[in-house]
């Protein structure tokens, strides 16, 4: 009995002493919260290289693809990679019975062969900021839930108008941590997006939820696009 008791105490002591640095952090908070700790654990990027408003950083390479996916910009010419299933609808829309890019695949050999995709956009994060104090300054404990909601929504609209530069940017305001903090995000959308390459459907289609939890699994779940824009974006 004694040895089991000692073993149980040892396990509990070990569990209690384990510190889990896990979770998700807003990019602008990495420097303040845990930037030095991440570097001690082997991260080679500085907080400034992860998120910077004035200089190129990781935030400029990881983008939103058509609202529901992410993509990675891999060249200064706007080439980007995303999942095959993220580009699926655009590839399907470009396909015809004669040129079934979805079934047979497609790779442009030069810029002229790239195919303009309709109703597709890529969204870059320009900057984000904390507006918790501003919004909380408009609230008071005596407000009803409806009054609180109305004040917050009005402030959201004001923040969006102040930062959109007459529609140049898309501005999104979100609450975090169960409504205790508020941040706004300024995005720039690029709508001239062209298909550069996609594998055949038999290679690219990853199988959805049916195959998503099966291993080993080998799929080429990728597609390649390029963003075009003028000097003003």
What are these regions (language model features)?
Residues 1-22:
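Bacterial Sec-dependent N-terminal signal peptides
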Residues 16-233:
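Terminal presequence/propeptide segments associated with secretion/organelle targeting
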């Amino acid at each position: 009995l004694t040895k089991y008791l000692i073993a149980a105490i040892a396990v509990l002591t070990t569990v209690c002493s384990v510190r889990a640095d896990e979770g998700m952090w807003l990019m602008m908070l990495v420097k303040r919260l845990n930037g030095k700790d991440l570097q001690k654990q082997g991260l080679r990027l500085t907080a400034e290289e992860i998120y910077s408003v004035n200089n190129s950083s990781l935030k400029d390479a990881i983008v939103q693809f058509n609202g529901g996916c992410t993509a990675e910009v891999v060249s200064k010419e706007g080439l980007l990679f995303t999942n095959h299933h993220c580009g699926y609808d655009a590839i399907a829309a470009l396909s015809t019975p004669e040129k079934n890019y979805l079934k047979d695949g497609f790779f442009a050999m030069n810029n002229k062969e790239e195919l303009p995709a309709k109703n597709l956009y890529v969204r870059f994060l320009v900057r984000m900021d904390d507006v918790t104090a501003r919004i909380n300054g408009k609230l008071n404990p005596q407000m009803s839930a409806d009054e609180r909601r109305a004040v917050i929504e009005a402030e959201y609209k004001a923040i969006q108008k102040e930062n959109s530069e007459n529609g140049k940017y898309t501005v999104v305001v979100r609450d975090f941590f169960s409504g205790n903090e508020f941040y706004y995000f300024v995005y720039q959308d690029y709508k001239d997006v062209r298909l550069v390459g996609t594998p055949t459907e038999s290679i690219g289609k990853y199988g959805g939820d049916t195959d998503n939890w099966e291993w080993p699994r080998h799929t080429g779940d990728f597609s390649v696009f390029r963003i075009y824009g003028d000097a003003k974006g």
